[in-house]
C-alpha cells in the first residue's frame, strides 16, 4: 500500500513539473511579444523624430544587442518558432 502512495506521489510531481514547464514556456512567449512591441514603439518614436538623431538610442540598445541579433537572425526567422 505504501508503494502505491509513492507511485501516486511521483505521478503527481511529474504532472506538476510538466504543467509548470508549459506555463513557463507560454510566459516566455508573452514576454518576448511584449519586448517586440516595445521595440516597435521605439522605432515609431524614432521615425517621428527622424530629424534629431542622438546617441541615446545606442545606450538603450547596449543590453539588447545580442538579443536583437538572435531575434533577427535568419535561422531563427526560418524556424518560425521564435514567437
UniProtKB/Swiss-Prot annotation:
Protein topology in the membrane = Single-pass type I membrane protein
User: What post-translational modification does the entry describe?
Assistant: Phosphorylated by host CK2. This phosphorylation is necessary for interaction with human BTRC and degradation of CD4.
Cytoplasmic topological domain = 26-83
For this UniProt entry, which segments traverse the membrane? 5-25
List the keywords (alphabetical): AIDS, Apoptosis, Host membrane, Host-virus interaction, Inhibition of host innate immune response by virus, Inhibition of host tetherin by virus, Ion channel, Ion transport, Membrane, Phosphoprotein, Transmembrane, Transmembrane helix, Transport, Viral immunoevasion
Main location (coarse class): host cell
Q: List residues modified as Phosphoserine.
A: 50, 54
Q: Which GO terms describe its biological process?
A: receptor catabolic process; symbiont-mediated suppression of host innate immune response; symbiont-mediated suppression of host type I interferon-mediated signaling pathway; symbiont-mediated-mediated suppression of host tetherin activity; viral release from host cell
Swiss-Prot/TrEMBL domain comment:
The N-terminus and transmembrane domains are required for self-oligomerization and proper virion budding, whereas the cytoplasmic domain is required for CD4 degradation. The cytoplasmic domain is composed of 2 amphipathic alpha helix that form a U-shape.
Other notes on this protein? HIV-1 lineages are divided in three main groups, M (for Major), O (for Outlier), and N (for New, or Non-M, Non-O). The vast majority of strains found worldwide belong to the group M. Group O seems to be endemic to and largely confined to Cameroon and neighboring countries in West Central Africa, where these viruses represent a small minority of HIV-1 strains. The group N is represented by a limited number of isolates from Cameroonian persons. The group M is further subdivided in 9 clades or subtypes (A to D, F to H, J and K).
Q: How would you summarize the oligomeric state and partners of this protein?
A: Homopentamer. Interacts with host CD4 and BRTC; these interactions induce proteasomal degradation of CD4. Interacts with host BST2; this interaction leads to the degradation of host BST2. Interacts with host FBXW11. Interacts with host AP1M1; this interaction plays a role in the mistrafficking and subsequent degradation of host BST2. Interacts with host RANBP2; this interaction allows Vpu to down-regulate host BLM sumoylation.
- State what this protein does: Enhances virion budding by targeting host CD4 and Tetherin/BST2 to proteasome degradation. Degradation of CD4 prevents any unwanted premature interactions between viral Env and its host receptor CD4 in the endoplasmic reticulum. Degradation of antiretroviral protein Tetherin/BST2 is important for virion budding, as BST2 tethers new viral particles to the host cell membrane. Mechanistically, Vpu bridges either CD4 or BST2 to BTRC, a substrate recognition subunit of the Skp1/Cullin/F-box protein E3 ubiquitin ligase, induces their ubiquitination and subsequent proteasomal degradation.
Protein's name according to its UniProt entry: Protein Vpu
Q: Write down the species.
A: Human immunodeficiency virus type 1 group N (isolate YBF30) (HIV-1)
Amino acid at each position: 500500500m505504501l508503494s502505491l502512495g509513492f507511485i501516486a506521489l511521483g505521478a503527481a510531481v511529474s504532472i506538476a513539473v510538466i504543467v509548470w514547464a508549459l506555463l513557463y514556456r507560454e510566459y516566455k512567449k508573452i514576454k518576448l511579444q511584449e519586448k517586440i512591441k516595445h521595440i516597435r514603439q521605439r522605432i515609431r518614436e524614432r521615425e517621428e523624430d527622424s530629424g534629431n538623431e542622438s546617441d541615446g538610442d545606442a545606450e538603450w540598445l547596449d543590453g539588447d544587442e545580442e538579443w536583437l541579433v538572435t531575434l533577427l537572425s535568419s535561422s531563427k526567422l526560418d524556424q518560425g518558432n521564435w514567437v
